[in-house]
Regions:
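Short loop/turn motifs that connect adjacent beta-strands in outer-membrane beta-barrel proteins
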Residues: 267-273, 298-300, 337-344, 382-391, ...
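C-terminal transmembrane beta-barrel domains of outer membrane proteins
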Residues: 3, 414-579
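Outer-membrane beta-barrel translocator/channel fold
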Residues: 306-328, 334-335, 339, 353-362, ...
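Transmembrane beta-strand segments that form the barrel wall of outer-membrane beta-barrel proteins
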Residues: 240-249, 260, 271-282, 288-290, ...
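Periplasmic polypeptide-binding modules associated with outer-membrane biogenesis and secretion
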Residues: 20, 25-26, 44-249, 278-286, ...
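Residues that define the transmembrane beta-barrel architecture of outer-membrane proteins
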Residues: 225, 254-258, 284-288, 324-328, ...
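Feature captures outer-membrane beta-barrel proteins of Gram-negative bacteria and organelles
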Residues: 258-267, 286-305, 326-336, 373-381, ...
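Membrane-embedded beta-strand positions of outer-membrane beta-barrel proteins
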Residues: 241-243, 262, 274-278, 301-305, ...
């Protein structure tokens, strides 16, 4: 206790005598209050404004849409009139119409051997192998066929129609800006070969726009071998959002919380979204975030304002401690890769943060500001490895500058943690869901961060709560550096009960994490901590409709919780309804 609050006051930088006396007076009063609280096993420093922001859960967003359907209108190909049963001597096989592959490559694919006697059926099978090769490599409208021909000297020709775009038409039936919509189709031009990858990329970018639906049609063009592309953009839902409830709040500001998010989609035709998110635990914590973002080509740019106020209760109620957080933000994202199976986004932003903590018992006020620039990458990938799986990952580099404006708090910081000033942080995340059987899947995730120096609590990571080691409370072990690992075995109950609605999983899990409290310790106390737990859970969800998560976690080991009363087990419940 003394190491935290007295912090070698005599070693503070030279200040006015009166200011040093005020520091001593305030620290003594807080110390007296905390000594009274220290009789309980879970006493800790009062959680301030920066720590309160840590309890806000990730925003609940609708999952991205699947690849918009591509309807292909059939087109006939000329066929040979020779009888199927007739066998002919073929000395050479020629391929015409190809540009993407050499003739030798395509002939090799057929397995043709010069001097063979083959039937029309066998020749058609060779043509089918060529067509299948094109389609396997993404040229999904390509055709290969036997044209009507006179066979001379045993020479047979297979004709290839690789498929090229004819007319490209955008039929926009929404208020979405025509230049914006057509700009997302740039790169697909008349005369280009029809390939699935670039087409799906453009359709996905269009379908990512909130408030619109996208479908496309490939119809036979006016010229042989061409397909006209018609892209229809129709109105989607103008208002979306969610309501949520959980028990993942801070123990001292209210564990039970309710919240709601409302999105107004595409109000000005710029692929824009105006959003409002609110969350409350009652008088203990109230949170709100308003944001607006719009598209400029493929780039999304946005602004946001966040506000939070809190008031400590429970054992800290006698302090009459309360505070506020305000954050003004600008942010942006750009899709580096957008496809059916692989996505990668570049992200960046700037936050101007203001923190205020007040303790009425001691008439003390602590003001801090932070300017934070961050940039990163985030992506996901679907694959067929080991029966199929999905991976996600992110990496974020933060450059910040903390300004402790209250002289007394700055003096204490200078003698202890020295968080004031410039800092850097590198945060990482990786996760994978792996299919084992139709009923069983495995999940693994790791989250962590590295720091350049001791960090303000607003930049620290914690080990407790439903997104970390679930056997410990929210706010447990806030630290500068560390990691959390989550491992789960998931059993799909719907496979056992055919009438089971939606997707329901029984989950068994193990969580573990280790942290270094201070990057540069200033006391001789224990600076590291390791926590672990295990438990079971039940998850129930329907795509973009609702989510229910319930977990029971038991501690592994004897580490005592300090952010809330210690318990051997903890129960977490999360409810989300999308609209």
């Amino acid at each position: 206790m003394r190491a935290l609050f007295w912090a070698d006051i005599d070693g503070l930088p030279s200040t006015k005598y009166e200011e040093k006396e005020q520091v001593m007076s305030n620290i003594k009063l807080v110390t007296v209050a905390l000594v009274a609280l220290s009789q309980s096993a879970f006493a800790q420093i009062p959680p301030g404004a920066g720590g309160q922001m840590q309890q806000i859960p990730p925003e609940r967003v609708l999952q991205k849409k699947a690849v918009p359907p591509i309807r292909i209108e059939p087109v006939g190909t000329p066929a040979s009139t020779a009888a199927d049963s007739v066998k002919i001597l073929v000395n050479s096989l020629n391929v015409t119409g190809q540009t993407l592959y050499s003739e030798a490559q395509l002939v090799a694919i057929t397995g043709f051997k010069p001097g063979s006697e083959v039937s029309l059926t066998e020749l058609r099978a060779m043509a089918a192998k060529i067509a299948n090769h094109y389609r396997t490599n993404g040229y999904f409208v390509a055709q290969a066929y036997l044209p009507a021909q006179d066979i001379k000297d045993g020479s047979v020709t297979i004709a290839v129609i690789e498929g090229r775009y004819g007319n490209i038409t955008l039929r926009n039936q929404t208020n979405l800006s025509d230049p914006l919509a057509s700009g997302l189709l740039d790169g697909i031009n008349s005369g280009d070969t029809v390939a699935i990858a670039p087409l799906e990329n453009r359709l996905l970018l269009l379908s990512d726009i909130p408030g619109v639906n996208v479908r496309s049609t490939l119809a036979p063009g006016t010229e042989v071998g061409t397909s006209d592309l018609i892209v229809d953009v129709t109105p989607g839902r103008r208002v979306t959002g969610s309501v949520e409830a959980d028990n993942a709040g801070n123990y001292y500001t209210g564990e039970y919380r309710v919240g709601a998010t409302v999105n107004l989609n595409n109000p000005f035709g710029r692929g824009d979204v105006a959003s409002l998110r609110l969350m409350t635990s009652g008088s203990g914590m109230n949170y709100g975030r308003a944001s607006y973002q719009a598209m400029f080509g493929k780039t999304t740019l946005g602004v946001a304002y966040t506000a939070l106020n809190y008031e400590l209760g429970k054992e800290f109620a006698p302090l009459r401690a309360h505070g506020t957080v305000e954050i003004a933000s600008i942010y942006g994202s750009y899709p580096l890769i957008r496809s059916r199976n692989t996505n990668l986004y570049a992200l960046a932003g700037f936050d101007a943060k203001t923190f205020k903590d007040e303790v009425d018992l001691t008439s003390s006020v602590t003001d801090k500001k932070a300017r934070v620039l961050w940039a990163g990458l985030a992506g996901n990938h679907l694959d067929s490895f080991g029966g199929g799986g999905a991976s996600s990952y992110s990496l974020t580099q933060t450059f910040g500058d903390l300004d402790i404006e209250t002289p007394a708090a700055l003096a204490v910081d200078a003698a202890t943690a020295r968080t004031n000033g410039h800092y850097q942080k590198l945060a990482y995340h990786a996760a994978r869901v792996q299919r084992v059987t139709d009923r069983i899947s495995l999940y693994g995730a790791i989250n962590g961060q590295f720091a350049s120096k001791n960090l303000d609590i607003s930049e620290k990571m914690g080990l407790g709560g439903p997104y970390a080691v679930r056997a410990y409370p929210v706010g447990e072990a806030y630290s500068d550096e560390g990691y959390v690992v989550n491992l789960e075995v998931r059993l799909l109950l719907s496979k056992f009960f055919e009438d089971m609605p939606r997707q329901m999983h029984l989950v068994g899990f193990i969580d573990a994490g280790a942290v270094t409290h201070n990057r540069n310790p200033w006391t001789n106390g224990d600076n590291d901590r390791t926590l672990s737990g295990a438990g079971i859970g039940l998850t129930w969800a329907e795509y973009n409709n609702f989510v229910v998560n319930a977990y029971w976690a038991q501690k592994l080991g004897n580490e005592v919780a300090t952010a809330a009363p210690d318990k051997n087990g903890r129960f977490w419940i999360q409810l989300v309804k999308y609209f």
